Amino acid sequence: MRQILIAVALAVLVSTAGCAAFGGGGDAEPATSDGGVVEANDPAADATGVNQTVRLSADESVAGSEWTSLSVAYPRENFTVESAQHGNVSLGVDTDDDGEVDERYDESHVSGVNNNAYSFTVELDTGYELSAGDVVVVEYPAVNNPAEPGNYTVTATLNDEQTTNGTVVVE
């Protein structure tokens, strides 16, 4: 229930942010994943340039370390990940797990945005020390949905240490 509340709160935050970081995009209802790991602002099959918001709760394996990267891998035969400029990637940390981003970072904190046809990695220099329970939030603006509706497993990795699977629903 708590994860559903967090996902709903994030959807409201994203849709009302306007021009601020984590801005909304369109009228589509976000597609949530199990565990709230990945949300797509447009769940339609064949949608292009879809904003994907990744929310990953830090665990003990990364607690005490600086937030240095987040990677997301999609099924290579289904999704296409395009490149994104540093300034188009939104970054933040929800430090108290209330669904709202408390710490925000801009393109000056991004040391690299790398992608291939099915994944992306955002490399960071935030100076932010992760605590267990912190929820890192990254919005990546350039994912193309598959042509076939379905549930697709996505893997998100925080600091090359913590890996979590989620499901993106394409309608």
Kindly give the residue locations of the regions a language model identified.
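Hydrophobic alpha-helical segments
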Residues: 1-33, 70, 122, 140, ...
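Low-complexity, serine/threonine/proline/glycine-rich extracellular segments that form mucin-like
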Residues: 33-95
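Acidic, glycine-anchored loop motifs typical of Ca2+
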Residues: 91-103, 115
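Short, conserved beta-strand segments of beta-strand-rich sandwich/propeller modules, principally
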Residues: 11, 137, 151-153
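Short, ordered beta-strand-loop transition motifs
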Residues: 44-49, 105-121
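Low-complexity, intrinsically disordered segments enriched in Ser/Thr together with acidic residues
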Residues: 119-149
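Serine/threonine-enriched low-complexity regions used as flexible
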Residues: 144-164
